[in-house]
Amino acid sequence: MLNPDGVIIGNFRTSYSGKDLNRQFFTADKLVYPEICALNELALQLKQQYKNRFEYYFDLHSHSTRTGLFCYGPEHQIWSGYYLRCRAFAKLLERSDEMFSYRSSIFTISEHKKTTGRAKMFSGLHIPYTYTFELSNGFYQTVGEKLVPLDEFDMLRAGRVILEGFYSFEKVHRASMTVLHTAAIGNSRRADLSRTTPLKKRSMVRPTSKA
C-alpha cells in the first residue's frame, strides 16, 4: 500500500499532503512523496537487473462511479505485436470471471493520466504490460446485467482473478513465443542452406540441329 496515511485518515485518493499520489510519478519530490520516489527507484533497479524480462506492472485502485473490475491498459500502436496481446490478457480475465468487464477497460493514456504510475512504467521504462486495475466501491454487473453488491470477499476474489489470469496468460504467451522462436530458427536454417547449397550448372552445350 503506497498511501497508508491517506487511507487511515479517510482520504479518498490523496495522501496526508493532500495530493493525488498517482499523478506524481514524473515530478515526485522526495520530501513530499517518499513512497513514489521509492517505487520509481525500485522499478528502475528491476529494469536494470532484468532488462526486457521485466514485462509487467500492475497497480490496484478503487473506483467510485463505475461498476465491477476493469483495467486501464498500455497504449501500444496498432502495428505493434503488443497491441492485441495486451487486450488478449484483459479478455482472458473477462472469460475467467464475470466480475471483470472488458467493455469497461481502456487502452489509451489520456492527457490527464500521463503522470500516473502506469504511464511512467510504460513510456519511461518501456514495460509493455502496464495495467491499472480498478475495482468498484459498490457493485459489479453480472452477464445478465444484474447489479451485485461487493464485499470484502469479492475484493479477495478480484485479486485472485487478476493473478490466476496472469498465470494463464503467461503460460499461453510463453508457449506461443516458443513456437515462434522455433519457427524462426527453422526459417533461418533453411535460408542458410539455400545460400550454401550450390546450384546445378546449366549445360552450355548447344543442341544439334536436325538435318
At which residue positions do the language-model features occur?
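Structured catalytic-domain cores with a bias toward divalent-metal coordination
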Residues: 1-211
